[in-house]
């Protein structure tokens, strides 16, 4: 049994980027779709789509990873912040830019999963899921 599916998703992305895979497959869920959507909006991945295999009860998200023109990684680091054993919540005023605005934090809010920039703009706080740079 998996205790932290979001950490599993982030680890799969981190491992795929390290070996320069063009895509990564991840078991689907609503929160993971939200994470993938934020990563696409913020320019860390090219695209994502959901695929369903006939023999599998759960669909998969296929994330198309993004690399620079010379093969450099767009995602330099991706790490889990709030964990099942230690949840971390933050108000919008407490959300400071990551690496001077070069990175993002992904927040789970009452409005769905959004980036820290959107949370500051809309003045919404929530659970800080992860940090990407």
Swiss-Prot record:
The keyword Transport does not apply. GO terms for biological process: translation. One of its GO terms (molecular function) is structural constituent of ribosome. InterPro entries: Ribosomal_uS8, Ribosomal_uS8_CS, Ribosomal_uS8_sf. It holds the Pfam family Ribosomal_S8. Disulfide bonds: none annotated. Keywords: Ribonucleoprotein, Ribosomal protein, RNA-binding, rRNA-binding. The keyword Ribonucleoprotein applies. It comes from the Bacteria. GO terms for cellular component: cytosolic small ribosomal subunit. Belongs to the universal ribosomal protein uS8 family. NCBIfam families: PRK00136.1. One of the primary rRNA binding proteins, it binds directly to 16S rRNA central domain where it helps coordinate assembly of the platform of the 30S subunit. Part of the 30S ribosomal subunit. Contacts proteins S5 and S12. This is Small ribosomal subunit protein uS8.
């Amino acid at each position: 049994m998996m205790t932290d599916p979001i950490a599993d998703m982030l680890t799969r992305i981190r491992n795929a980027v390290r070996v320069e895979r063009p895509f990564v497959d991840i078991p689907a869920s609503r929160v993971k779709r939200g994470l993938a959507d934020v990563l696409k909006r913020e320019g860390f991945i090219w695209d994502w789509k959901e695929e369903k295999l006939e023999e599998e009860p759960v669909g998969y998200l296929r994330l198309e990873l993004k690399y620079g023109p010379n093969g450099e990684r767009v995602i330099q680091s991706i790490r889990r912040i709030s964990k099942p054993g230690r949840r971390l919540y933050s108000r919008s005023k407490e959300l400071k830019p990551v690496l001077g605005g070069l990175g993002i934090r992904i927040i789970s809010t009452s409005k769905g999963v959004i980036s820290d920039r959107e949370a500051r703009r809309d003045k919404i706080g929530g659970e800080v899921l992860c940090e990407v740079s």
